Amino acid sequence: LHSFPTRRSSDLQFRDEVKLRDYYRGKGGGMTDAQLDVLFARRFAYQKEYAVANTRAIVALAHEYRIPLASHDDTTDENVVDAVNDKVAVAEFPTTMEAARGLHAAGIDILMGAPNVVRGGSHSGNIAAVDLANEGMLDILSSDYIPSSLLMAALQLPRHVPAIDLASAVRTVTKTPAEAVGLSDRGEVAVGRRADLIRVHVARDLPVVRSVWREGRRVA
């Protein structure tokens, strides 16, 4: 799988520049407006010079070697058009409902971070994974920056979204991501699959992994 970020220099993860600046101040240790002006100007200049050519080269290589592609932080209808034209398989962390609806309508799997479910929203102030799930537009959960959040989110999702049962929630961290990247030998308990399994105990609403099997052999 190859993932690339937003390709157009006119796009921002945040449509509100005030929120963008607040985000970078927190992330950058208190940068001033003047420092942010320099940072943004430099990054947009790099993007304008290199983004299109690099993206076209990456997409061509991915298609040649049959490597699935993922878009990242799609925000606008224009981003959706790019994703469709590039034959993207997965859309990581769309930042607006507008983009998510367009991606979903195009048949592209939508991926959100499991921490987004666990903490009740995006750490950067973008759309909540549960809001997407309520509209039937959440296909895959990734661990993002907290690996242990995968199981936690799979257990919590049915509580937040009654239309999603536990089996469907578990598929967001097993079968669906495996299928999205072409790994047909894993992702579900079925004849002919790898038999990668875990045994989980739930204690005080938290999942605790008790046993692990890899290709049918217990390894933990």
Give residue ranges: language-model regions:
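Small/polar loops that bind or transfer phosphate-bearing groups
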Residues: L1, S71, A91, S142-S143
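Histidine/acidic residue-rich metal-binding segments in metalloenzymes
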Residues: L12-I110, S122-M137
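His/Asp/Glu-enriched, well-ordered alpha-helical/loop segment
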Residues: A106-N116, G120-V200
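Short, small/polar residue-rich loop motifs at catalytic or cofactor-binding pockets
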Residues: D205-P207
